[in-house]
Amino acid sequence: MPLRIAAAVAVVAFSGVSSDAYAENWPQWRGPSANGISPETNLPVTWSTTENIAWKLPLPAWSGSTPIVWGDRIFLNVSENGGIHLWAIDRAKGEPLWKRHLSDGDTKMRKQNMSTPSPVTDGTGVWVMTGTGILKAFDFNGKELWARDIQKEYGPFGLNWGYGSSPMLFGDSLFVQVLHGMKTDDPSYVLRISKANGRTIWRVERPTIAQRESPDSYTTPAIVRHGKSLELVITGGDAVTGHDVNTGKELWRADSLNPTNDFAYRIVASPVVHGELIIAPSRERPMLAMRPGGRGDVANSHIVWSFQNGPDVPTPVTDGTYVYVINDRGIMWCLDAKTGKEVYGKMRLRPSTYSGSFALADGKLYITNEDGLTTVLRAGPTFEILAENNFDDYTLSSPAVSDGQIFIRTASALWAIGKPRSK
């Protein structure tokens, strides 16, 4: 199945939006198929602050939130003047079209300033969550459609480093997870919310055996198709769980992400789905490959392979043939997706801290470190660096790819890389 349809097929069936429309855009944090892959071709390989740049838009602050792109619009979560705001940007000009206030409060916690969750869009509406628990919907002209305060409704978030999960947009619904425990005794839970009116379709608690900081999860959910059914995949609290998307009921579970019962095993890297392959990272080890369709405890039945070098923060990417993994220290592996065996391993990229995640497109891997240097690698079984492109600016977010351009958000600017579009 072509990459652009690998996960988007289910979205199309669910929502009526064409797969081509999803493919050419970057509608949520992990792109058109929610797995970091884009079918785009002829993408830039080399650039600098002065070369191969369509435009540069100054920004007021750093953020872990990734830009999302649909057609002629780009949307950003922005921390500014003590609050969190949604910016809509003209893609051709690189200028703000409108700004909307989301929430007061931009508490700074290392790599968190309450703007971390990335927005999502279906080309008609845009939905955005903040680290303060505000969830809002807007149309493309900036009209607010509805708003909710998740903390007010269900209690304060209790994560050690603040709430950072992005909503998952799938068909007519948003899936929002709140997995916490370090600073609260309240249960973790998952919500399915109507994108049209903001009403809760279901809410289910998600139990955990994890202790202290280990219940905390900063991941974003994923959807996997198994036969004719759809399963929502959640990682965190030492476990991988699969849920019925229609009811939220937990179908299966593997309490296998923290075998040593470490008390500080929060999870940041999100689950990744390609076809019926689920990649479930943990903080350090293990990283699991699983198959869906199980019932009950699947730790001994549905784990395909286990890899003992986890990414910690960056989310892996897989094209179904290879799984590419990089940890927060810039050490990279390529694994056989079917067996988990190393194709190559412990290859070191430029020394730095890596908080962003891979984008895989045009036969290339793009990864940006916290110093603003993007390494471009050839995808495939051979480790080959094609280029290193440096913006020399603090960077936490991941590259976004759309219609021949790459968008990278640094602390001081949003950069559009590639040929300018007609204005």
Tell where the protein language model's regions lie, with residue ranges:
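Bacterial N-terminal signal peptides
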Residues: A6-V17
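N-terminal secretory signal peptides that target proteins for export/translocation
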Residues: M1-P2
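Noncatalytic, solvent-exposed loop/strand surfaces
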Residues: D20-K423
